[in-house]
Amino acid sequence: MGLPMMLQQYCWAACLVICIAISSVDDVGAEQNYGREAVEGNIRLIHGRTENEGSVEIYHATRWGGVCDWWWHMENANVTCKQLGFPGARQFYRRAYFGAHVTTFWVYKMNCLGNETRLEDCYHRPYGRPWLCNAQWAAGVECLPKDEPQGSLRMILGDVPNEGTLETFWDGAWGSVCHTDFGTPDGNVACRQMGYSRGVKSIKTDGHFGFSTGPIILDAVDCEGTEAHITECNMPVTPYQHACPYTHNWDVGVVCKPNVEGDIRLMDGSGPHEGRVEIWHDDAWGTICDDGWDWADANVVCRQAGYRGAVKASGFKGEDFGFTWAPIHTSFVMCTGVEDRLIDCILRDGWTHSCYHVEDASVVCATDDDDTIEIEPKHTRVRIVGMGQGQGRVEVSLGNGWGRVCDPDWSDHEAKTVCYHAGYKWGASRAAGSAEVSAPFDLEAPFIIDGITCSGVENETLSQCQMKVSADMTCATGDVGVVCEGSTAPPSGMSIAVIGGAAGGGVAGLAVAAFAFYYIKFVKPAGGGGQA
């Protein structure tokens, strides 16, 4: 039995609307194709995270096809971006930076002068030789946003992305920086601002890479080297009011140290010592999900960034250090606290995640010699390391490796508390160097407990004591120890395990849920922050 004619017409109309709607949402999602209509010679960017970046495709013979990265350079990128309506290019990319998604290639050996209005007007080898290129050689660009921030930087005329003549954006125009007094601190700030966390490798003068075609904007830039942005540097000469010759012979160039897998940087903080943690992986900066993120992870990040340690690892709100379009690279980082680089830690989920950017991990690193803050560690463990049962060197863990105790005021009060936790009735302190304190091995500790203060009352726990934790590894008085007697059961909720040592002796380890406040003191290294 058929449907009434009117109902059939409604059904066909509904189907038509649905089909049109489906066809209009082509490429919606994480990998959008930003570009122009399918007209001969038009171009588009695909697989970028924003509309101003991606692999370059050109429309020819009724099909979109890629551009091979042979001869691909900054002038090609500038023409590409200007054709798409952007002010110019910030960066050019080779080797399928945005992924090996392009399967058909129309153009190779593209070589623009920079004054062309369309990419097809540039010199290139004839269309239609797709077998000469493959998906790993797709050319890409990052275009300057249409509303470029004051003081933005870019490099032009270099053969590789991390070098070139330095240009800055000021009052609506791109122009050069005069090389007067431009040194390593200035280059470090410039390179880090442009995404190269390791800073500058070398400074090039006298227009080494070629000359800017814009005005000469900055002269006598004077940075300390710790600034996050060149606009934070001292500028004794007003922009555009330079004392350089009115030619570009003094244009400064930079060679930035290329990023290395596992490099880290801190973004959008009030200074270089704090911010959202980003890690360099697979040739791109990305964030880390804060699932499982703790003080041990933050401590490794801060040391890798050139600081002594972290003063804050959690309790951030998503908006504290802003949001980013960068990918989320990983989650559940598991550090012991002694690693030199974050990439040396265990990545429980590998390079995968199931997070959103509101969960990006952040840190605040120590900056001053007298930085004193309060943290609340999740778990504190104490162990006695020696050749005999119940006697030896005292070591403490805050979840980031084991630390030695250096305390000139070490007394029987503290020893009694430690022994009580280890399951003994009594305890006596021992000074460094005494026979009872000798341990079977040395300890490479990431920190030193440079003070434990207990009252010595009956059944006192470590959560009732105060600790000062220092990343300064010097200890004039030597490690402290204890001699415990009167073995008994450990306090409720704690356990002891012999994890090493000779017969009749060993290392007694116990887990202590210590929700005390610990006063953390860090010492700033020579030279301040910044990644080595």
Curated annotation (Swiss-Prot):
PANTHER family: EGG PEPTIDE SPERACT RECEPTOR, SCAVENGER RECEPTOR DOMAIN-CONTAINING. Residues 31-491 are extracellular. This is Egg peptide speract receptor. Residues 43-144, 153-257, 264-366, 382-485 form the SRCR domain. It is a single-pass type I membrane protein. The chain crosses the membrane at residues 492-520. The keyword rRNA processing does not apply. Residues 521-532 are cytoplasmic. Receptor for the egg peptide speract. It is found in: Membrane. The keyword Signal applies. Residues 1-30 form the signal peptide. It comes from Strongylocentrotus purpuratus. Disulfide bonds join C68-C133, C81-C143, C112-C122, C178-C244, C191-C256, C223-C233, C289-C355, C302-C365, C335-C345, C406-C475, C419-C484, C454-C465. Keywords: Disulfide bond, Glycoprotein, Membrane, Receptor, Repeat, Signal, Transmembrane, Transmembrane helix. SUPFAM superfamilies: SRCR-like. It holds the Pfam family SRCR. GO terms for cellular component: membrane. Glycans are attached at N78, N115, N459.
